[in-house]
Amino acid sequence: MLPPVPSRLGLLLLLLCPAHVDGLWWAVGSPLVMDPTSICRKARRLAGRQAELCQAEPEVVAELARGARLGVRECQFQFRFRRWNCSSHSKAFGRVLQQDIRETAFVFAITAAGASHAVTQACSMGELLQCGCQAPRGRAPPRPSGLLGTPGPPGPTGSPDASAAWEWGGCGDDVDFGDEKSRLFMDAQHKRGRGDIRALVQLHNNEAGRLAVRSHTRTECKCHGLSGSCALRTCWQKLPPFREVGARLLERFHGASRVMGTNDGKALLPAVRTLKPPGRADLLYAADSPDFCAPNRRTGSPGTRGRACNSSAPDLSGCDLLCCGRGHRQESVQLEENCLCRFHWCCVVQCHRCRVRKELSLCL
């Protein structure tokens, strides 16, 4: 039986695979349940505000669950060449998340970001009744960062994209609403109690994930008018692609800061006193990661034996690093791939399935 896990782990399990929340791990190959009724039926362990959200806004909970899964898929993409590749296909994944290491910081940040991103996107698509497009009232004039269409004549300052020449319009992505729901559901169980360093670290990483979405939201603008007159100029806020969010958080993962708690347990300090305190966008961890080279039930390391590697690459995907110096073997395998693809009007791409033989390098 697994040891007690932090509340955030239980919540992630609930969001991603509610049918298996009692087992406290992410089940092998199980379908990820999207039905909010199933999620909330397993919500006995949720805090008051989470239970209220389940009861009052189950469709929002469904989007939060979709966003958490989006985050895990992005984690698997960004970590695909690392020794720990964010695989959720074993009980070991839950054991990894019980440690306050860099990898856990990334998982919590990317799932909080995914929850915010998914809810915000659902608002803009009209899929949630509780929200819609971003309200422009009381906001400063837009400063375009991306133009669609032909820019019009110069504005008051001599530039076609001068702020006074543009107005808010279109359907902007309401990141405020997405952040609010992500924060309400993902942060609710954490208590900033005395000595609870883990809660402080996880709350910080949650917020860093949401900030990665918000801070890379861009302003897109478009000119409207006959013959390129640009009689009307409108701008709206646009979410960044989630792949971009993942890439930004991976950069933060590489530069993550190790921290420790203050004596009263109410704040965090750099583990190395000579370093400056981490910023809001930084990821935090409190313990060193295992090397993930060999299987280890205690740490959740699945090891790298049998992993495909690149025999000629000097980076993380290379056999030297991925195989931890154990060497690798060559194996010839037969795979099926799409081939002879043709576009048929309109609008279908049809492909044949071809068998190809490839040489793979596999870790010993």
From Swiss-Prot:
Q: Where in the cell is it found?
A: Secreted, Extracellular space, Extracellular matrix
A GO CC term assigned to this protein in UniProt: extracellular region
| Alphabetic keyword roster | Developmental protein, Disulfide bond, Extracellular matrix, Glycoprotein, Lipoprotein, Secreted, Signal, Wnt signaling pathway
- In the record, which residues receive a covalent lipid, type O-palmitoleoyl serine? 227
Which family does the entry's similarity section mention? Belongs to the Wnt family.
Subunit relationships:
Interacts with PORCN.
Q: What is this protein called?
A: Protein Wnt-6
